[in-house]
Amino acid sequence: NTVVVSVGDNFSGSYFSRITRGNPLPEMFREMDVKMSAIGNHEFDWGLPYLVDTAAVCMDYIAANIVAKDDHAPLEWLEPCKMVVQPLKNGGSVKIAFVGLTTTDTAVKTRSENIRGIDFVNPVDAARVQVATGLKKEGKVDMVVLLMHIGTDMSNPDVIEEENAKRLPWIEGVDAIISGHSHKVVLAEVNHLPIIQAGVNGTHLGKLNFEVKQDAGKYTIQYIGGDTIRVAGKGNSVIDSLVNEEMDKYGFEEVLTM
């Protein structure tokens, strides 16, 4: 009963990605059964045409606070949220809504021509609108998760780093926050809300566990703990072989495991 998601910066952000243009990644996402992703600031590195016509074709991106610049209308190619119907072992299913959010710093962290025609609005306001439209109140979903490319840090008193996003844990109806962007390993609770971030470059997997109980046809979902699992460590010969095979296609030298 696992839902796998990403918090963005999928196709760019490293030297290797600049050479490959992210070509190896669609297959990886399919094998991992990644359901969706937030949009990271690096998603815009190669401009909107690449994001819309290439990256967004093989990955379901969501972002509630990326809108048209002229009138702040929704973008045709981008959904603010996505629902996953997750089957339960004992029968039935729960409906989980993921609301995407992107750091507003993207406006100053990428070239202006790469984000022409779009705007990044306040993430708290955007998330509140999605939840208030009836995701929970109208019984459309059983659970709401914010999937955000907005940094968090355990050393920050508020955990969430960006000033315009600090109130996200206080939005009524939100059950969890999955974050990225600051490259830190985070597992915390703010306002009794779990917040997790799994480091950078696939070094960790973030895992949030929830218990689902059914009573009179309604589901009660309770957070029962999480973990940040380190997956980068001692070399794995099978994985190293696959990586080297892929890198050989682009003229890279053999990967050495330290």
List the model feature ranges, each with a label:
Residues 219, 230-258:
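Hard-cation-handling environments
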